[in-house]
Amino acid sequence: MTSIGIVSPQSMFFDTPLPLQSGAQITDYTLVYETYGTLNADHSNAVLVCHALNASHHVAGTYSEDAGTTGWWDNMVGPGKPLDTNKYFVIGVNNLGSCFGSTGPMHINPATGKQYGAHFPVVTVEDWVQSQARLADALGIKQFAAVMGGSLGGMQALAWSILFPERLRHCVVIASTPKLTAQNIAFDDVARQAILTDPDYHGGDFYAHGVVPKNGLRVARMLGHITYLSDDDMAAKFGRELRSGSYQFGFGIDFEIESYLRYQGDKFSTYFDANTYLLITKALDYFDPAKDFGGDLTKTLSNTRAKFLLVSFTTDWRFSPERSHEMVQALVNNNRTVTYAEIDAPHGHDAFLLDDQRYMNVVRSYFERAYEEIDGGSLKAGASA
């Protein structure tokens, strides 16, 4: 299997206001995206990949010969890979509110002539899906072969199946959940408080002060990273190993796990925007499509039309297998076609990004079967695309 190679992002400007769930609107905006593979003649082989918290439109390939610019899901997407770009036309979109190109807090607010900062409106998963649908319209894609995502990306895929049931044939939801638990909301709030109470945050207008709330971002990332790993994985990687071989009897770094978390926090604070972090964690917290159906997930999913693949990981305690079980049961209650795989993997929530061959084979097999609908299957025989 080879990489897609060097890729370039594209952008599309929208001058029609986007109404948001909050009641606010974004008057005009830009979406940055990348595409891989070739769109077929009837536009029936398009797959939308939705990204998680700190990822972006850069799903696969590289921006140069430097491997450090490799896309965040390059092991999943590419020629001969589970989502095979020799067969599928894959789209990665950067969500509104992000800091990787699409309109967000770092951009100029046309109403003020200044950067949005903390004044960028709160966006939800459903708002992102609405903006993605507009991009699909502009690209001439009436129906996706699949919408796919892991973690927060999986929430977007699920929302697609609810909001636009006729616009996707397959919905692939990996390491995700139909709503956050109180514990998950608590983690997000502590992370936000770390940023909001950093003196360099300046009420979200830190750009004008020429500073970055690095300490808040560092702590937020450290906390988040703990939730992405499993206890077993941390024990195997770090255990109680000491950085210098003995206790220092101070408040610096003694343990290797401390060194690792601080490294992750430091790195994150150099490239991620604090306002974006606040926005995206709020979008996570607010996602609860069953809320409008009295909490009944079966009713929530009753109008879906897609076939589903759900994947969970045994040691993922952020979005545990029980959350996937809830979605599977609700879909079964609605007589939907569901494939479910629970992968015994030690890597916690981050397992959805890693090269577990059992996991990769599940996804590969699913997309191979889905492609039969396009190449000589029901779509080629004349079914609507």
Swiss-Prot record:
Location of the AB hydrolase-1 domain: 45-355
UniProt-annotated site: Important for acyl-CoA specificity, residues: 318
Localisation: Cytoplasm
Annotated catalysed reactions: L-homoserine + succinyl-CoA = O-succinyl-L-homoserine + CoA
Positions contributing to substrate binding: 221, 350
PANTHER family assigned: HOMOSERINE O-ACETYLTRANSFERASE
HAMAP family to which the protein is assigned, alphabetical: MetX_acyltransf
Name of protein: Homoserine O-succinyltransferase
Organism whose genome encodes this protein: Janthinobacterium sp. (strain Marseille) (Minibacterium massiliensis)
Gene of this entry: metXS
